[in-house]
Amino acid sequence: TESYFVFSVGM
């Protein structure tokens, strides 16, 4: 899962 990617989008 691209959790880090989703986190970046959340920022």
Curated annotation (Swiss-Prot):
One of its GO terms (biological process) is defense response to Gram-positive bacterium. GO terms for cellular component: extracellular space. Found in the liquid endosperm contained in green fruit of coconut palms, also known as coconut water (at protein level). Signal peptide: none annotated. Has antimicrobial activity against Gram-positive bacteria B.subtilis (MIC=150 ug/ml) and S.aureus (MIC=170 ug/ml), and against Gram-negative bacteria E.coli (MIC=170 ug/ml) and P.aeruginosa (MIC=169 ug/ml). This is Antimicrobial peptide 2. It comes from Cocos nucifera (Coconut palm). It is found in: Secreted, Extracellular space.
